[in-house]
């Protein structure tokens, strides 16, 4: 019996090819048992097993032989197995990434929103910056412009990254990074996203910074946007595809 078809990586890992997995659980169990012994004898450290959802009936057999869940996607489950005890297995994604836009018009008014789903309707609106989570593979500058437009109807131009907050214990045991960006509005007519946003308006900056119902954090990040030069998007000629990488650097560097 041959080992299940696989590739390897430079870290001593074996990556089982999903297309090489049999449909029958009993056949898979026998092949997997033989393969693990073979890979262990060859000195590999870790096995990565991606099971397509169409072959999910194989998962039980993998778990029975010592595989552990690592992460999942819409159409697959990734499992891992340590051929050598205590071999390092890198964790899956550790962070969520979000961005908020500081959008100020020529009248020194700040674009703010209050979310619809925030508990009691008796509380005053909790005004904050428009923004939200980045999509998979989306650039930060693109995401914050998109989120501002989706929530408020305001088209905006990305100017610079101002500051960010790093928060542990956010959701499902992961951490969260929230980037604060300065944007220039290209129009001023608000078209509110009714599904998520209860209130959306242009608020005088002074009123926002003095308001009791605006959190200290939200005031501070707006102050940072007003006072900090921040870092701007740039490109590096000797680097890889700009569609895959995004750089923010102080302006004026040679």
What are these regions, as identified by a protein language model?
Residues 40-51:
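Conserved GNAT acetyl-CoA-binding A-motif
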Residues 83-127, 156, 160:
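N-terminal strand-loop-strand
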Residues 2-11, 15, 19-30, 38, ...:
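Nudix hydrolase/Nudix homology domain
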Residues 78-80, 112, 180-182, 202:
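Conserved hydrophobic/aromatic beta-strand scaffold that supports enzyme active sites
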Residues 105-107, 167-190, 205, 221-229:
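Active-site-adjacent beta-strand/loop module that shapes the phosphate/pyrophosphate-binding cleft
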Residues 49-56, 134:
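Conserved beta-strand-loop-alpha-helix junction that forms the acyl-donor binding cleft
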Residues 57, 64-98:
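Long amphipathic N-terminal alpha/beta scaffold segment
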Residues 128-161, 181, 186-189:
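The catalytic Nudix box helix
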